Regions:
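Active-site loop/oxyanion-hole signature of alpha/beta-hydrolase fold enzymes
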Residues: 54, 65-104, 260
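Conserved alpha/beta-hydrolase catalytic His-Asp/Glu region
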Residues: 140-146, 155-209
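Conserved HGGG/HGGXW glycine-rich cap/lid loop of the alpha/beta-hydrolase fold
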Residues: 12, 16-73
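Flexible "cap/lid" loop of the alpha/beta hydrolase fold
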Residues: 116-120, 129-157
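Conserved loop-alpha-helix segment in the C-terminal half of the alpha/beta-hydrolase fold
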Residues: 214-246
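Catalytic active-site module of serine/aspartate enzymes centered on a nucleophile-bearing elbow/loop
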Residues: 238-284
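Residue in the alpha/beta-hydrolase core beta-strand immediately N-terminal to the catalytic nucleophile
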Residues: 103-104, 127-130
């Protein structure tokens, strides 16, 4: 299992290199680095590994995936789940891997909180953002954290008192059982919920300070589609793509359309190739 140690914590990482002979780039040119930042609790790097990372790598980028602190196969600590900690973890992982040039961050759901704050904290290290159904942007405190905390609070009770992990394992659902056990330990055994409650939204004035290009992709029926519209209004260089007929599960249920949009955007900004399937996709 590939691991790196950053800030004294073990992180599970996976990397995918582009094809060795990439006609889209000169032989002496380093490929762009695209880093994938997943969502909370039941999510991990596998959600990107089986959807976006392979095609992005095949298009000529070096894909970097990692499990957030306490998620997947990364080390779980009792505390340290604030946005600032997540940003420091991200750059710690990149430093451990030797990636110090500006990178492109592809974020899903809560991963957007990490990506946005990373772009604001270290603009010299972030070349661009792809925000997929991402939390973070809001005009007022509590706009998205209240719903998220309510959902996680209910999940915490089910995991702890109904012993969901044991039930899933008992009927042979091993992967889901392991995920539930990890989620139980995370929400009931760490400072995660308290740290989330303290996170401030990224307001319009801060969004206006984002210096890198941003691609925002949201589902038409998503509860947080207004976050995408706020990004479009506030970020100086932002492209918004709303996926018709979709809600929050764009990454899983709209992968092909999402890839078409994202690969064209990366080709324009990062210099990767545009595969035939992406050329046939909808326009930005």
């Amino acid at each position: 299992m590939p691991e790196v140690t950053a800030r004294g914590i073990r992180f599970h990482v996976q990397t995918m290199d582009p094809p060795p002979a990439d006609p889209a780039r000169g032989a002496a040119s380093d490929p762009p680095v695209v880093v994938f930042v997943h969502g909370l609790v039941v999510d991990d790097l596998s959600s990107f590994y089986y959807t976006l990372a392979g095609p992005v790598s095949a298009a000529g980028a070096r894909a970097v995936l990692y499990d957030l602190r306490g998620h997947g196969r990364s080390e779980r600590t009792p505390a340290g789940y604030s946005a600032a900690d997540a940003v420091a973890d991200l750059f710690g992982v990149l430093d451990a891997l030797g990636h110090r040039r500006p990178v492109y961050l592809v974020a899903n759901s809560f991963g957007g909180v990490v990506a946005l704050n990373a772009a604001l904290a270290r603009p010299e290290r972030v070349a661009g953002l792809v925000m997929i159904e991402s939390y973070g942007p809001a005009e007022r405190a509590g706009e998205w954290t209240e719903n998220m905390l309510n959902t996680l609070g209910k999940s915490a009770l089910v995991l702890e008192y109904e012993r969901l992990a044991d039930q899933l394992l008992a009927i042979g659902w091993r992967q889901r059982g392991r995920q539930a056990r990890t989620a139980d330990a995370l929400v009931n055994g760490t400072s995660l919920l308290d740290d989330l409650a303290a996170i401030e939204p990224v307001r319009p004035a801060d969004l206006a300070a984002v210096t890198c290009p941003v691609l925002a992709v949201y589902g038409e029926h998503s509860d947080i589609v207004d976050a995408g519209r706020l990004l479009l209004r506030s970020v100086p260089e932002c492209t918004l793509h709303i996926m018709s007929g979709h809600a929050h599960t764009v990454l899983r249920e709209g992968t092909e359309q999402l890839l078409a949009v994202m690969l064209r955007w990366l080709a324009h900004h990062a210099g990767t190739r545009v595969p035939v399937m992406a050329m046939a996709g909808g326009a930005l």
